[in-house]
Amino acid sequence: RCHPLGLEAEGDQVLTRMLDAMNADPARRWTEADVAALGMDPSTVRRAFKRHYGMSFLELARQMRLREGTRALAEGAPVIAAQLDAGFDSASGFRDAFARLFGHPPAAMAGGAQGLVAEWLDTPLGGMIAVADAHNLHLLEFTDRKGLAAELQRLSKAAGGRIGLGRTAVT
């Protein structure tokens, strides 16, 4: 059985302390200096995250920030507000990170849409993107999958060019 947050993650004080700090401030732009200020060795933290999650703590922190921006957009916030809420100083940095994940810039997906809607889901295995309409789940994929943007672009094209952000009864 798979227990990604089971004894191994719970027993690793480095993971536990760092995740607690990251969850307490998801919009923070973490640096290795911040990790050192918490009394931890950045290389130890980096190795622990790579071993357990397959990504560095900086990559996970960036995903957490992007998740916050995505949720703000899904709630109807303007793109600039979502960018700032997510801790991105640069509009282009937020746009680029969003487009790498979704295959479209945030303005193309902001607000509700008729038909397909994408939602960011937190799971014990990591972040996932679900795309559904009112009756069917069309896509469920991990956010760190390299082919996700291309898959979302193909799905968007098949759906007439637009996928909104939000939630449906399916998700």
PLM region descriptions:
Residues 1-92, 100-102, 107-171:
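Basic nucleic-acid-binding alpha-helical/helix-turn surface characteristic of O6-alkylguanine DNA
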Residues 96:
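An internal, acidic/charged active-site-proximal segment
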